[in-house]
């Protein structure tokens, strides 16, 4: 598989989306790009995304510390990734990594079609795994965990002709059992949702946190995120730490319900599907 060729002057610099210097690159995560506004927390507008790309594609002054570059990623595989985000990425000259739910492609409305994923790969973007059905990996039985990891990897590799070496953990949830399973399945990179945990390696798996991009994040907020001052970083760390404490107190399942309420998520407003939903879906097209 060829390397992504990213402009060397861009804030999004990376020789490869995965071979970035340890701890030296911020990773941004988008979900849906929408033509207009939405109450959904991760529903970023097309105009907003275009402004973000303008910032990321322009030469940026580096602070004395050397600054940070940014890797653009998408989670879920919403069809807006192709219809709205892909054309804007092509215009900007930037590349992204799309972590998609292999079990939903070509089967469920609002998800990518395989033909669309192939077009993005052909244009130099990467498509990697977000699991098979968006089940929280920490809540899976050993057999279901293996299915989520290996089935998605094999499906993506077979359909797209790519090497799948990275996975974005649904909900950002992971633990040592998940890391072990990822290693057995042949992954090399595991992305989660805590950007303040130092990049590390366990059992041959590189662990990397990411910043979730929300609908409230304008260009100035993005700039501060990528090049934060000490006070801003302390505030962001405190806020994320508070969220993690609430999650630990409530447990994954109850916290997920709480998150859905906070994020204004409801069916059709983002992507949360279970294996049985996919098993009962009759709309699969093997040639889409």
Can you say where each PLM-predicted feature lies in the sequence?
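Short beta-strand and adjacent tight-turn residues that come in two discontinuous sequence segments
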Residues: 99, 130, 192
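Histidine-centered divalent metal-coordination motifs
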Residues: 31, 128-130, 134
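Conserved SAM-binding loop
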Residues: 94, 135-137, 157
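Active-site glycine- and acidic-residue-rich loops that bind
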Residues: 76, 105-110
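A short alpha/beta connector and helix-capping loop motif
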Residues: 80-102
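C-terminal active-site subregion of NodB/CE4 polysaccharide deacetylases
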Residues: 2-73, 78-83, 139-146, 150-165, ...
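Acidic (Asp/Glu)-rich catalytic clusters
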Residues: 20-22, 57, 86-94, 112-129
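Surface-exposed cleft-lining segments at the edges of enzyme active sites
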Residues: 102-105, 134-142
